[in-house]
Amino acid sequence: MRNQKVNILHMGLGAFHRAHQAVYVQRAINAGQPLAIAAVSQRDPKVSEELAQMGFKYVVRESDASASRDEEITSIVATYFYPKDYEKLAQIVADEDFLAITITATEKAYLYSDDLQATLPGRIAYLLHQRYLKTKTGIAVISCDNLSGNGEITKGLVLKSALLLNDGGFVEWVKSQVRFPNSMVDRIVPAPKDSGLLITEPFMQWVIADDPIKKYLSGVGVQFVSDVAGYELMKLRLFNAVHSALAYIGELQGIEFVAQVIDDPKYLQFVSDIQMQAAASFTVPAGESASDYSAAIRKRIANPTLGHRSQQIAMDGSQKLPHRVFKTINELIEKDLPFNYLAQLLAIWVDYLAKSDRVNDPLAEKLIALAKAKDVAGLFSLPDFAVKLNPAAFKSISAELANL
């Protein structure tokens, strides 16, 4: 283990973090930056324990049809399980030299509870309060989850949770000294078969709104930009949305991997059609091309070496689709532009909910009952969704469902 004090705490010790943020930090370390990550598992201590047993060393293999490349990662120097280790985590965050909390906890983690230790935002509020009590130096809290405006969402929930501590000075400190830059991350990382070897694609991207953390992460491929929004929307609407579509098709057709689904010309065309319509809903960042980006996404998904399972991508649709599809349809309706392929995507989701015996979703019971009844209006009017879908879309979704 390197003799470097932990200065980054990562909430969400999954395969994605280990094949993405930890790789960027490793490359920064290789370039001479004094960085070290403590990574936190919040659901199951098994991953934390396995990484510790491996001496906090593992291999990331970048692979495509033409070649593969291995990289040893040692940027994670400690692992913990929350809530068991919350006191140790508080000590880490309270250290004067601590820099940032980063997060990959999936969309469903962004909830509020009046039990401070029950949710991700509450836990972050608690850790920040422990820092506030020891030092008033600010830090960054960087959400890397697939939420548009993830920094603002995180800040709002952390501030709401902070009110539970009845410390007005702390709330003001969070507002003025804790930074919540928006960020966008991208890399296809399937669930690993071996915790010591993560297989991923050569492509990797991390875009962060301008922040002092740039001092440590510049020069290793992290992009610091004035506005992340365009990059977020490209990823959510041109990549994540079609990834979901392919996953539901795969589950319905009994096709194990999304690369096999997109290998079918009719599904490849469907993906292209979704991307074409979605691209009309927003403006891409300067220097980017929606058509080139979309084509690159199709090629990346088709990578046959990744083994990315339809079942893995299909889970938690109620948490993903509002951000990936609902907002897009709403904006296309406002612009009086066609959205039939996106309506078809949602119809396929409803069909999957009605027919699959492998639905894994926090709203599964409600969704399945409504999907089996083909109650499109009832399903998409549920108050549980983070984004309300414009009811003007219901008729189109029903028509697409009838045509499946």
Question: Where is each model-derived feature located?
Answer:
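Substrate/ligand-engaging "lid" and interaction regions
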Residues: 1-404
